[in-house]
A protein has these predicted regions:
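Bacterial N-terminal signal peptides
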Residues: 8-18
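Disordered, low-complexity segments in secreted/periplasmic proteins that are enriched in proline
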Residues: 24-26, 193-206, 211, 239
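Noncatalytic luminal/extracellular "stalk/propeptide" segments of secretory-pathway proteins
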Residues: 26-35, 54, 58-197, 257
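Soluble metallo-hydrolase cores and metallopeptidase-like ectodomains found primarily
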Residues: 32-35, 112, 117-120, 124-150, ...
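Second-shell loop/turn segments in exported
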Residues: 36-43, 59-69, 135-141, 149-150, ...
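Short helix-loop-beta-strand segments that form the rim/entrance of peptidase-like active sites
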Residues: 51, 59, 361-386, 402
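Surface-exposed loop and adjacent secondary-structure segments within mature catalytic domains
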Residues: 171-189, 234-279, 309
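A glycine-rich helix N-cap at a beta->alpha junction
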Residues: 393-402
């Protein structure tokens, strides 16, 4: 599949970089069929795309922006681009992004009434627990604002289960499938999302019930911080072995303006409660045991490290210079960073590997595009497209609006 993606990308790149108008009407330059055939042969018979993907996911592994892992992966990518003969391969700084973070050690277990390891993972930028915590957990089962009073004085130093059990539905069909031509045509012809409606992106307007749930969740987080909980456990999204683990929560009262709020990445961010996501199947079991009155006891240890000496991040950049139209640039790129709890294979080492393989093939064949082809491997995507936006702002145009 990645070989096919590379072949498609290369066809478009060569078309744009050589001056061939893709799908245009009227006179146009002819395709260099010999070059296309060479690209296909190199890509299908001598592909390195899976080796690139394997290295990124197996050796550096998770590539959280600001972490030692992503810096090692970026240096490797820059070195490979240079080895392949790309010009001006470098790490281009942007930021400030904020402090880096890495997980140094972690364990989580049910120890009473019987032993069982828990499938769980700390959230990014969570502090550590300063050693092993062993205690009976507190189930923070506040379903209304009035319920919060029942937990005053009970959360200090506690391991807290943040919310109720989440329903896990049975899967009777495969979660993934290959799209047919009819499916793709239907997607292509679909009406664009209406702002404020379903699928309307940032203009989506929550319902009254959703706003109430968000307000209650905020009050719970503020209470956890104020009371001094020792650790928060949350049910993970996903099921059947899939967990989604993102950034730790730093809650602010609603009356604090957004521009006055820190993020967990900020060097001077206020202290927060250590936070761990638990696989929903294991989390639900803990809730059921507590509701049955079982003497549940947990043992958790979280060890993390922050890196605040250098608050900048970087993108990996390299290019194949053009000839007579070298001042015109054809960009290809993919986000290089990932979250920390997996190896970031599909999101997005796959895309990064395809882009790297595309420029490798062009260099290997010695093709001379008219326009400059530039590759960008972006960081900070998972925190809001930060790296690519910084690059566009620096080299092309400032973004208008929020």
């Amino acid at each position: 599949m990645l070989k096919r993606c590379t072949a498609i990308l290369l066809t478009v790149l060569i078309s744009l970089a050589s001056g061939v108008a893709v799908g245009a009407q009227g006179p146009q330059e002819k395709f260099d069929q010999a070059a296309i055939d060479k690209i296909k042969e190199e890509g299908m018979k001598h592909s390195q795309v899976m080796d690139i993907l394997s290295y990124l996911t197996d050796v550096p592994g998770a590539r959280l922006t600001g972490s030692p892992n992503i810096k090692a992966a970026q240096n490797w990518a820059k070195t490979k681009l240079t080895e392949w003969g790309l010009q001006n391969a470098h790490l281009e700084a942007w930021g400030p992004f904020g402090r880096g973070w890495s997980l140094e050690g972690f364990s989580a277990s049910l120890v009473k009434p019987n032993y069982a390891p828990l499938i769980a993972y700390p959230k990014a930028w969570s502090p550590g627990t300063n050693g092993v915590l062993r205690a009976q957990p507190v189930y923070f089962d506040a379903k209304t604002e009035a319920d919060l009073d029942k937990y005053k004085g009970k959360l200090k130093g506690a391991i807290v289960l943040l919310s109720e059990a989440r329903e896990v539905k049975a899967h009777y069909e495969a979660p993934g499938r290959r799209q047919s031509d009819e499916d793709l045509l239907q997607l292509a012809n679909a009406e664009p999302p209406v702002p404020g409606g379903p699928g309307g992106g940032r203009n989506f307007r929550p319902t009254d019930a959703q706003r109430a749930a968000q307000a209650l969740a905020l009050k719970k987080w503020l209470m956890l911080q104020d009371e001094g909980a020792a650790l928060v456990l949350e049910p993970g999204r996903g099921d059947g072995g899939t967990m989604f683990v993102q950034s730790a929560t730093l809650a602010y009262p609603q009356d604090v303006p957004r521009d006055k709020q820190k993020t967990v990445r900020d060097k001077d961010a206020p202290a927060i409660v250590p936070q761990v996501v638990v696989a929903v199947e294991h989390y639900n079991r803990l809730i059921r045991m507590i509701e049955r009155g079982a003497p549940v006891e947990l043992e958790v240890n979280v060890s993390t490290k922050f890196y605040d000496q250098d608050l900048m991040s970087a993108n990996v950049i390299g290019e194949i210079p053009g000839t007579d139209l070298k001042d015109e640039i054809v960009m290809l790129g993919a986000h290089f960073d990932s979250w920390h709890s997996g190896t970031g294979a599909t999101d997005n080492a796959a895309g990064s590997a395809v882009c790297m393989e595309a420029v490798r093939i062009l260099q290997r064949l010695g093709l001379k595009p008219r326009r400059t082809i530039r590759i960008g491997l972006w960081s900070g995507e998972e925190q809001g497209l930060l790296g690519s936006r910084a690059y566009v702002s620096e080299h092309f145009a400032k973004r208008l609006g929020p």
